[in-house]
Amino acid sequence: MLVEGPSELLLFERVLSTINPFYEVDGIYILSVEGVGFSQYCKILNALKIKWIVKTDNDLRRPRGKSDYVAYGFQRCNKIIGEETLPIQSYPDDSIANKRTLYAENKEALDDIRANCGIFLSVVDLENDLDEVLHDNLCEYLDTSDPVAYLQKAKHFHMADLVEAITDADCRTIFGHYNFACLEEITK
């Protein structure tokens, strides 16, 4: 599984080690691409005939010199697929509400991309999607009323703290949730 960065890597390793402590023996690996440059990794893995899955954020970004934000996460998915499957829309801001709306309006296509292309776009991003699954527990473990802001402030370090705090039951909850269906898919 290809992921954006160390936060995803830490969390997903913790979850998978609970579900299947020997997942690497079964040929399951998680690789951080340290950004969003998935396409080259996918090409190499395809050439080697290695199955891959991508987990990436539903980013809205403002192109240089423009006032509106575009669906950068959708562009990323289209690039990996090699065709324009998802619409590229403009938004006045990069709010979480806009990301959720964008996802909801295209959920059927995104589910098809999950099933047929192995690309799992977050509804929003790692931290918001995780908060949707475990909000109360995150508040308790991280001693904050805003776990998303806390996790995004110092991503790697704060995710390391969280990974130590979450329980096996939390891991099973994450594993079984739609937002993290990539984890179940990679274990098939």
What positions do the PLM features span?
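Acidic, divalent-metal-binding catalytic cores of TOPRIM
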Residues: M1-K188
